[in-house]
């Protein structure tokens, strides 16, 4: 199971109804943060997500609405006596900006902070990988892919009977080692399992104008979280942002299963934006949602569901 928490869905500045960008992925007990705008620690507290379970923060770029929540996160971790290291990843200048943040007050964390400046790369972490790719925002900026490793197929009962195998430690050994000797025969894992199951693929663009690299890295993603700051090109002007139609076009061409539109400009109310945005997506044949703060998309057993944490508590 994987959960995607939309802690902040607005852009540029906070409003009464939405905070600035922060996306949290919860996977096998770990919380991975993508961007951390101001107020992210408060949003995490409201969502009941512990910052102590965050080992990695991936920053897309250094405009304030995407990174100014980092100092408060670090200080909170320190107050809670964090011991394990924190890893912060981002584009060129990440080391410089993190150093500036840590030097901005009378404060020194009691745990190690490791800073990683990335270009386009592929990072491996146990059961998943993070890919970084360049986007177009007028400054050094990255998008990210969370890619779960493919999983083995399900054990086939008829094949287990054929080879005289039963559930228990022997199947655990077969799964760990890939093959075993049993009753004088060599049995391979693929002999008794179905087709391998594709791991989940989640893509987060950060801020970007339309670019082909987003389409390339989003191919057949389960979820594409694409900025769609503006409803129409006339509102955009010369800014390096995308419209709803441009985000939908990318998702359609990449054959994305689900598109989440975020980072809408503060000029739009949620009601006005979502009505127009979903009309555009429907006209292009794209399945889409417009998350609010504290919406959660849960992926489990090949399906997904959307819920809102605050509504659940009413």
Swiss-Prot record:
Its cofactor is Zn(2+). Signal peptide: none annotated. Zn(2+) 1 binds at residues 61, 63, 137, 207. SUPFAM superfamilies: Metallo-hydrolase/oxidoreductase (SSF56281). Keywords: Endonuclease, Hydrolase, Metal-binding, Nuclease, tRNA processing, Zinc. InterPro entries: Metallo-B-lactamas, RibonucZ/Hydroxyglut_hydro, RNase_Z/BN. The active site is at 65 (proton acceptor). Binds 2 Zn(2+) ions. CDD domains: RNaseZ_ZiPD-like_MBL-fold. GO terms for molecular function: 3'-tRNA processing endoribonuclease activity; zinc ion binding. It catalyses: Endonucleolytic cleavage of RNA, removing extra 3' nucleotides from tRNA precursor, generating 3' termini of tRNAs. A 3'-hydroxy group is left at the tRNA terminus and a 5'-phosphoryl group is left at the trailer molecule. Its EC number is 3.1.26.11. Zn(2+) 2 binds at residues 65-66, 207, 263. Homodimer. Belongs to the RNase Z family. Zinc phosphodiesterase, which displays some tRNA 3'-processing endonuclease activity. Probably involved in tRNA maturation, by removing a 3'-trailer from precursor tRNA. PANTHER family: ZINC PHOSPHODIESTERASE ELAC PROTEIN 1 (PTHR46018:SF2). NCBIfam families: PRK00055.1-3, RNase_Z. This is Ribonuclease Z.
């Amino acid at each position: 199971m994987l959960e995607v928490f939309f802690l902040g869905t607005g852009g540029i500045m906070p409003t009464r109804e939405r905070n600035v960008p922060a996306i949290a992925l919860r996977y096998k007990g770990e919380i991975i943060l993508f961007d951390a705008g101001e107020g992210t620690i408060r949003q995490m507290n409201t969502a009941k997500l512990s910052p102590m379970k965050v080992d990695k923060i991936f920053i897309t770029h250094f405009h304030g609405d995407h990174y100014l929540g980092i100092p408060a996160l670090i200080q909170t971790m320190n107050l809670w006596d964090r011991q394990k290291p924190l890893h912060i990843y981002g584009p060129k200048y990440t080391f410089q900006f993190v150093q500036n943040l840590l030097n901005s007050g009378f404060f020194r964390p009691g745990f190690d902070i490791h800073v990683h400046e990335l270009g386009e790369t592929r990072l491996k972490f146990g059961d998943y990988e993070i890919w970084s790719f360049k986007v177009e925002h007028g400054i050094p900026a990255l998008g990210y892919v969370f890619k779960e490793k493919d999983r083995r197929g399900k054990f086939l009962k008829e094949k287990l009977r054929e080879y005289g195998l039963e559930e228990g430690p022997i199947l655990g050994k077969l799964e760990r080692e890939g093959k075993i000797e049993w009753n004088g025969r060599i049995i391979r894992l693929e002999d008794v399992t179905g087709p391998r199951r594709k791991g989940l693929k989640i893509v987060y663009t950060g801020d970007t104008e339309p670019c082909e690299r987003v389409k390339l890295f989003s191919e057949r993603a389960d979820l594409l979280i694409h900025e769609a700051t503006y409803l129409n090109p006339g509102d955009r002007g010369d800014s390096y942002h995308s419209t709803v139609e441009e985000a939908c076009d990318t998702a359609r061409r990449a054959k994305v299963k689900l598109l989440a539109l975020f980072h809408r400009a503060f000029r739009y109310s949620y009601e006005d934006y979502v009505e127009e945005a979903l009309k555009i997506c429907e006209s292009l044949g794209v399945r889409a949602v417009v998350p609010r703060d504290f919406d959660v998309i849960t992926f489990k057993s090949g399906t997904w569901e959307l819920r809102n944490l605050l509504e659940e508590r009413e």
